[in-house]
Amino acid sequence: MLTIVPLGGMAGCAEDSASEEGPAEGEGSGGEVEPACGPEVPCALGDTCTEGVCGRGPIHDLLPELPAGQVAEERAEALVAEGMADLPGGRFAVGRPGDLVLRNDRVAFVIQRPHRDGSLTPYGGNVIDAVRLGGGDAGGGDVDELGEVMPVLHIGLTVDFESVRVLNDGSDGGPAAVVAVGRDAIWDTVDLGSLLGRFDLLRFDLNADLPLLVAAVYSLEPGSGTLRASFTLLNEGEEPLETSLGLVVDPRGAVDDFVPGRGHGAVGFDEIFASLPPAPYLAFHGARISYGLLPLHFTSEGAHPPAEGSAVLNLQGITAAVLGKPDILRAVSEPNVTIPAGEAATFGYDLLADATDAADVHEWWLRSTGEESIGMVRGTLTGAAAGAPEGARVAVLDEAGRSVTAAQVVDGGFEVALAAGSYQLRPATRSQGLGESTAVTVEGGGATEDVDLQLPEPAGLAYAVRTRSLGGEERSAACRLSLIGAVPPELELRAAFDPRKDPLPPGHVAVHYSRTCDSADDGPLRVRPGRYLAVISRGPRHSAVQEIVDLEPGETTTIRATLHEVVDTGGYVAMDCHIHTIGSPDSKIEIEAKLLAYLAEDVDFLVSTDHDVLTDLGPAAASMGAEGELSTTVGVESTTFAHGHYIGFPLPIAPDIPTRGAPDWAGGRGPSLTANQLFAALRDLGAEVVQLAHPAGFSGFFARSALTFDLEAGAFGFDTAARTPNEELRLGPGEPFFSDAFDTLEIATGAGGAGPGGRFFGGASDEPGMNDVMRHWFDFLSVGMPAVGVGCSDSHGLVERAPGYARTYLPALGGGGPARPDLGALSATGAAGARHGDVIVTNGPWLSVRGPGGAAPGALVTPDEDGSLEIEVTVEVPTWLAPPDQLEVFANNTYTLPASTPAERAMEPVHEEPLEYEEVPAGDGGVVLRATTIVTLATTQDEDAWVVVRAIGGEPLFPLMPASIEIDLAAETPERFITATEGRPPFAVANPLFVDTNGDGAWVAPLLAGAPSSPF
């Protein structure tokens, strides 16, 4: 642990300033500003009022000194942005007028004005843009692929900077500098207590109010690509303060985390208990730009990296580093600094913003830390006669096989600076894995080693596949190509790439989406030679091509075929209402790539639901020429850590706000919003649909509500003893938590129905993953809560949690253009002309449920005079998929909640029967599997009823969905080539028919009399 003493004074002057409202007015770009002050006009935080004039307060005398100005042509400047022209560009640039800019001829950084929003990094005063200025990119424009960098104190606190202003404008030839002053504040948009607290790991009070005054200084020297940030913490209390110092990075763009000794990829919860080396620095490695972050301690002798390195953890897509700790367990349980009363400690970071690759960052780190024995390795990489493959990298490993760094291959060449020593170099591409290892010995003193590396000769797979509609029209359409076979262990790519960002399913060598399903347009697939099963598909409404291919080195094999539309869902739109793109911190998938996947999986309507930011998919769809094939709307997933995730759509974009108009579920500087308050906030923003996202699980809506259902009383209640108090969830005391003001709930999240990963979500291990949510849903229906069941993917990648599975079918609106759904079918109150609740949830099979007179789900139906109710059920799947083999019908089923025993979990449908299929011609040359049955239910006039139909199977939906597989390379047919087990079985669920048993024209929930009077 480090005890840090007061530091020297700060050179420079306080100049232009910014407020939360916008730019300062009436202040020049040079000379010290001395605003008037008095009892009614206080000075900025950190300043003092002397004889009616504001001046620098004591904390300014504790800040690190800036280097003296230099006489040189190069200059750096600091300014308050008065308009957008003062701000750097880049696709992830979020700076707005009123923010402060530091820039030179290489880079620009934006420091946000005092601000508050609902992002993962909620307060202003931090770096929000790190930009390589134009000319360093093929397009010649500014490049920004980084989100925000924020200090973290006490593991769960940060700083609410109340004052941000220019400290030195750079006109003296020295560093341009900005100073921000604030106090510690709860990091309320990330509640680590709700995650780590359940494991009894934390030793810090995450709601503490520390006696700290904090001053940040951001400085940029002329000609440098590195920003230096320092955070000086003045202990204004009367006792020594033990705390923890750390940093958080939101690497929002197309960059992969890289940690020396571990390689690429986020360090997640599964690695907390692993013996991982601490990080000397962090790199964020991208194809267009890379960033380096070097944590720093400041003492009277200057700035230096922690000798012990830093413990690193990735959480919800953001990267946290705790200084001077070897691992996360010690980081969350031990302080790393003691600040005596009345004294200060300073820590910070250097941020490199114009690196080419991780190797560039590594060299920057070596030189920043004073390494004297540095040599250079230069080389070429070839991949057969065609030269180095696009996107290739060279991984550098030490003698023990640990990752040191990785270099991009540009125009067939690469270079990397290394400390003297022995290393292994391994070339790699994402499709071919790691190549053979080459040993090199690096001499110090600037010596250069030349090496030639070669990747194995790849094989090629070309394809030309057309799609034929039910009406016989043939055209080019998007498709998915999956290549399945024996995967060599060398495809573990962490040394060169992030293999866990969107990992391939078991046995898959490649998954490729094609806009036209023709390699003449996007090139053949290049992979390792071998024997594979190639599967070309276009979602569950079409046939598929399955062909065994023997791919030889240097040769290209071609598949030619036609995909047939075989399932007729006419009048219905396939919707995914829970998807993530690169706008979410835990997704790295470009919008265009995501849209291409949805085109290939044959989904018609998309709701963007990035975490706490609004993303408009429409412009990207238009640029791809896809606006006639799918339609989109804007939504949000409000991602509370403590009590669940909630979706609202459609929403308007607010372009002048960094979150683009997403609600601040953490409540600004007050208590966080309850579910009830958040639903209202989403409505106020314009949401027509409010949705519970994966509501089961240890911190989900159901659990946090402590919702119970008394089967004998037929009533919901709340287990107040089990419910976490509002104060522990950072909610307002006395505020009611539960609300029924939602429209939809995800009865199936993901292809398996259980939610993200299925680890803490969904049903018990002895039942289908969706059953837990369905039990709640059925109980809601029985007491008259109008909740529509939907299915969504919650897709963060292209392969894992695949786009479009589960999906929801709902009625289409009339008119021309791409299919759009009637969102009135999802509204709790319905809409004029809408078939309320005419909704099907599925991970593949098509399910049609029709009551008397052809009534669709959501309709009010009346039994025959003898009380019998006939329901016609049809299930269709293409022949390449395993169909559901069992039909279940539920009517007024109610369950004890929580269901903790097998008996309580028993679903007990009122009717079950096996489904029998026949092959039926479909469209022009296609074949579909179809099962049709008539279910007859006997009703009484004792109570009205709801009826839900579910089709469910036991065999995996492979190859549409991943599965555990066994491969027989000697087999001659696709059926024998792969045996799939333990995959995701098929399911489809129809929303309820409402049965008016006594024919009075009204429907009364069967247990309405037993429903609690409040808050329903």
Give, region by region, the residue ranges found by the protein language model.
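Beta-strand-rich recognition/accessory modules
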Residues: 68-76, 81-83, 89-90, 94-96, ...
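A short, solvent-exposed beta-strand micro-motif common in secreted/extracellular proteins
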Residues: 323-324, 420-431, 510-515, 528-539
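A short, amphipathic beta-strand motif
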Residues: 375-385, 412, 453, 459-472, ...
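Acidic, contiguous internal or C-terminal segments within carbohydrate-active enzymes
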Residues: 116, 120-133, 178-258
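Ser/Thr-rich, Pro/Gly/Ala-heavy low-complexity intrinsically disordered linkers and tails
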Residues: 9-56
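Short, ordered, surface-exposed loop/turn motifs in non-cytosolic proteins
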Residues: 376, 383-409, 468-508, 884
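C-terminal functional module detector
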Residues: 190, 468-486, 497, 508-517, ...
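A metal-dependent hydrolase metal-coordination microenvironment
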Residues: 544, 566-724, 747-750, 770-772, ...
